Each structure stands twice: as structure tokens, then as C-alpha cells.
Amino acid sequence: MAFREGNPYTFESKYCLVVVRYQNPVRLLLLAVGMLLARLGLVRREHVVRTTDLSWPRIVTGLARMSKNAVDVAMVGIAVGEVAIAGVGFAGPFWGIAFSLGGGFAAGTIALVSQGFGADAEDQIGQAVRSSAVIVLALTVPVAALFASFPLELVSLIAAEPATAQAGADYLRVVAFGVPFAGLNLVGSRIYIGADDAWTPMLVRGGGAIANIAANAVFIFVLDLGVAGAALGTVLANVLVTASFVLALLAGCIPGLGELPVKVDPFGTYLDRETITDVFEIGLPVVGRNSVWTVAKF
């Protein structure tokens, strides 16, 4: 990643210094495994440190993203009971469609941003970001409208019990509004990964996970909104993450972190045929692969 002054860790440090200064459990675990392999002569020590510094923020980001379902299920289970747990579980695969679409086309984003970043071509990066956002919105907004309009009919396809289907429908009806934001957030994360920065998406997505927990606690336990409250917390958290990515991309910095590697002009072209074609050609196979897992969940 692009190591910036003031980051909580730096690559220039030697292994022993890094371990003493930074007691991050994820990083230490990866580093310990890597150093064991290095001692066996299977990998180079400097590659272990570099790979660890690049990968551990991605692992934390993934955990933050995946925490959404766990938090929703746990909290509605405590507040409402088993029917709510089952309902949220049945609605989960529909939410996964957002990740199939957003994550798939984000593969095109990371490829084009990486090319532009390596060539120091800011215009190319901006075009890739804008076109990727258009593609994801064009695909996820209709999906969100479908989920919001026919939640009971959709959940009833896989849920036999009426009470469970109704709980799932209540959840899906609200969480549908977060689908476009979830897709955009995957693109936002990949923008920075393509610019060799795994730290920024980790902070943003981690903050979103914390916001999700806090919002769920208010909506479920204080306002007694049940499964709809869990869905509302998820939507709010995703909106906050999207807003954070947008502001960071427009400003090119985050207060307290300093300058970021990517800054995007929002007034450029959005419908660039060549860029959209590239994103589709790169991302479509990934969408297909992701869809296989989503279908398996159904």
C-alpha cells in the first residue's frame, strides 16, 4: 500500500521493531506464520513483512463487511426470537446479490485504477471510478426496487413458514434500500486497493461496522423495531460508508490521516464507452463466479 506519514504502521521498520510497536493480533498472526515459512526457507523474510502489511488490512476489512449478518442475526435473536433469526437468514441471500454485482464489477475498477495509478494518470483513474459507479448503480437500483416492492413474494420462494416469511419480508423490504450503497462501497474499497492503499478502506469499513452495531442497538432495543430495525441499521451504516468514500475521493484526504492516493473530479465524463466496456469485460466473469455462490446460498 502507499504508506503515508502518520499511519499507525510503516513498512520501513524491521521485523523486531514492528512486533514491539504494533500489537495487532491479525498482523502478528500472519507475521508469525510467514516468519515460520521464512525460517524453513520457503519464502523471503522481506516478502513476508511486505505481504503482511498489505494483507492484514484487507482481512480486517473483510471481517468488518461480513459482520453485518452476524450482528443482525444476534441482535434480532435476542430481541425477537427464533422466527426473526430464521427470517433474517432467509433474506440474507437476496442481500448477497448486491455483493455479487458490486464485488464483480469492482474487479474491473481495481484493474483500471491500478493501471492508472501505475502510469500516474489521474484522468484515467477518475474515469474508471465514475464509470464503475454508473454501472453499479444501473444494476443495483432495479434490484433494490424489486426487493422493496415484492419482499414477501421473494422470501416465500424459499421460506415455507408464514411467520418466518413475513419476518424475512419485513427485513428485506427495508434493507433493499441499502443494496445500491453496498455495491458502491465495494467499488470504493477496490479503488484504494488499486491505488496500493489497503489502510483507508479498512478504516472506513471498520467504522461502518461499528456504526451498524450502534444503530442496531438503538433501533432494535430502544425503539423496539425488531427485524426492520436491524435492516435500518444496516442501511444507515452502508450510507455512512458510501458518504465517507465519496468525501474522501472528492477531497483526496481524510482528516487525521493526511493525503490519500486518489482524488476524483466529480464533473468529468461518466458514460465513457471504452471504460464501461473494459469494466464489463473484466468484471462480468467475476460476477458470474460470485453468482454461483449466491445461488448456492438459495
Question: Where are the regions a protein language model picked out?
Answer:
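Short alpha-helical transmembrane segments in multi-pass integral membrane proteins
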Residues: 2-55, 113-178, 220-283
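Transmembrane helix-bundle signature of multi-pass secondary active exporters and lipid flippases
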Residues: 56-111, 175-182, 277-298
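Hydrophobic/aromatic residues within transmembrane alpha-helices of membrane transport systems
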Residues: 60, 64, 72-76, 88, ...
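Generic alpha-helical transmembrane segments of integral inner-membrane proteins
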Residues: 63, 67, 71, 101, ...
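Short loop-to-helix capping motifs
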Residues: 81-82, 161, 196-198, 226
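Small-residue-rich hydrophobic transmembrane alpha-helices
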Residues: 85-148, 182-201
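Hydrophobic positions within alpha-helical transmembrane segments
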Residues: 88-91, 95, 171-174, 201-204, ...
